[in-house]
Amino acid sequence: MMERAEDLRLSLSLSSPLIAPRTHHVAMLFHAPPEKRFLEMPLLPAAKRSEVVAAEEERAGLRGGGGSDEEDGGCGIDGSRKKLRLSKDQSAVLEDSFREHPTLNPRQKATLAQQLGLRPRQVEVWFQNRRARTKLKQTEVDCEFLKRCCETLTEENRRLQKEVQELRALKLVSPHLYMNMSPPTTLTMCPSCERVSNTNNNSSAAAAADRRGIRTTTAAAGGSVVDTAADGGILCHRPIAVRPQQS
């Protein structure tokens, strides 16, 4: 009986290290900062993820009281991440430095840490978390932009398909309508070309009149045009306006 109890205690002690890492990981994920929690959590749709990010950032801002809580880069005695509470001025200086240089070299890191009274490792961890948040927000913005583009293209494709169906229906109803139609054109002529066109039209009209046996003569004094037939008979008199000659 004693041997069986010892075996039972031994089996429990051997199995506990296999279960402990899973519970420890869950606890670490629960106590992790918002940006690390979002990177390790399963991906959600863009709308849900943006709502979660906004809610977590608002909650973090209320908890920080104007400052911010960041990872210290080290671990405590129980293995949990230590939090670094930054003041409002420290957060502002770090944000300004991040806008100028998203990635710092060791010299810049040491200078900034000395200026803020922090360790270089703390500054490095803050920049890593800030880059992760920026990348996540940019991914959400790109996702929303591509989603709107996809919706616009889908609507445009639907409209074009509807137009194609309408054109096919019209073509089936009246197939000869499109064959006889000529595309509309707009002609613009300069005055010189118009004079040349009028001269050509007059020549064509005169040639047609000769073919019909009609001759056109212009009376200089009377200022009229007389159309005569081939046998010499007068068909009609057409008065014309005589322009005075310029000296």
Curated annotation (Swiss-Prot):
Source organism, top-level taxon: Eukaryota
Matching PROSITE patterns: HOMEOBOX_1, HOMEOBOX_2
Signal peptide: none
Region (Leucine-zipper): 137-182
UniProt entry keywords in alphabetical sequence: DNA-binding, Homeobox, Nucleus, Transcription, Transcription regulation
Annotated InterPro entries: HD, HD-ZIP_Homeobox_LZ_Class_II, Homeobox_CS, Homeodomain-like_sf, HTH_motif, Leu_zip_homeo
Subcellular location: Nucleus
SUPFAM superfamilies: Homeodomain-like
Tissue: Expressed in seedlings, roots, stems, leaf sheaths and blades and panicles.
Pfam family, one: Homeodomain
GO MF, any single term: sequence-specific DNA binding
Region (Disordered) location: 58-81
DNA-binding segment(s): 79-138
Disulfide pattern: none
Listed GO CC annotations: nucleus
Function text: Probable transcription factor.
Family, similarity comment: Belongs to the HD-ZIP homeobox family. Class II subfamily.
Name of the protein described by the UniProt record: Homeobox-leucine zipper protein HOX17
Taxonomic lineage: Eukaryota, Viridiplantae, Streptophyta, Embryophyta, Tracheophyta
